[in-house]
């Protein structure tokens, strides 16, 4: 990605600091806050350094699960039923928050900090006590908490996307987690999870998730490369876009 240059920053690339780096291109192999939320991408833009991957906008949207779901829905992509809880609401009246979640989504639900990666702070709540604990945990990490209805018998599907304006999608893969869901421990600690490539999907379902991956990538104004995650209802076959990474 080549940063857009205007008159105001025309000389930034000629500064001693940038010249001293001796870089032709930056490939940011970074994760989480500051690394993939648009912060370092903004730094590259200011320094007029070409870099690989999503720009400031796509990175910021891709980090904020709540904003991302709104964008997906606006583009006509199906997302699992969800609601946003603010930490101040939880602190002020936990009982009201719990009641609203159950009334709106029922149980079970997944509770997630809106702006973290690697499934940090994510819990599956199956009862009222579990819901309280899950919201309290997520509130330790973020002021914005996403609560999402659990997709029945969910299959975790992922598709790689490559390109800028002309975008290509890989075949879909399927994650078989070693735990109840693909949480932090399943991703990084135990080695029991499996990845099936290609995912065992019917041709029509494979085509659907690949097209939805391209649509989701374009919805957030993606660039370079990304992984788009889906949840597939094991009973109905419905496909829900989960997030772009």
Which residues does each PLM region occupy?
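ATP-binding N-terminal substructure of ATP-dependent carboxylate-amine bond-forming enzymes
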Residues: 1-57, 61-63, 67-70, 74, ...
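Active-site nucleotide/adenylate-binding loops and adjacent lid/helix of ATP-dependent enzymes
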Residues: 16-20, 61-154, 211
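Glycine-rich phosphate/pyrophosphate-binding beta-alpha loops
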Residues: 32, 119, 175-179, 245
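Short hydrophobic/aromatic-enriched beta-strand-loop microsegments
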Residues: 50-54, 79, 169
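Phosphate-binding site of ATP-dependent enzymes
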Residues: 126-211, 237-240
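Conserved metal-phosphate-binding beta-hairpin within the catalytic cores
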Residues: 149, 159-161, 217-245
């Amino acid at each position: 990605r080549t940063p857009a240059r205007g008159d105001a920053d025309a000389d930034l690339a000629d500064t001693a600091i940038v010249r001293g780096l001796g870089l032709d291109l930056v490939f940011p192999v970074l994760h989480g806050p500051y690394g993939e939320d648009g912060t370092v991408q903004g730094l590259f833009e200011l320094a007029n350094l070409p870099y690989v991957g999503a720009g400031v906008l796509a990175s910021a949207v891709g980090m904020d699960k709540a904003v991302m779901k709104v964008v997906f829905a606006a583009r006509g992509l199906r997302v699992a039923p969800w609601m946003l809880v603010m930490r101040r609401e939880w602190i002020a009246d936990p009982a009201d928050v719990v009641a609203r979640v159950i009334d709106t989504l029922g149980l079970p639900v997944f509770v997630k900090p809106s702006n973290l990666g690697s499934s940090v702070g994510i819990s599956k709540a199956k009862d009222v006590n579990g819901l309280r604990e899950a919201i309290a945990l997520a509130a330790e990490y973020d002021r914005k908490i996403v609560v999402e209805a659990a997709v029945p018998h969910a299959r975790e599907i992922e598709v790689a996307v490559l390109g800028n304006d002309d975008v290509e999608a890989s075949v879909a893969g399927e994650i078989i987690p070693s735990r109840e869901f693909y949480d932090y421990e399943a991703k990084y600690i135990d080695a029991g999870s499996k990845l099936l490539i290609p995912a065992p999907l019917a041709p029509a379902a494979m085509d659907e998730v690949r097209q939805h991956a391209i649509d989701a990538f374009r919805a957030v104004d993606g660039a370079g490369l990304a992984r788009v995650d889906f949840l597939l209802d094991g009973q109905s076959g419905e496909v829900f876009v989960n997030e772009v990474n």
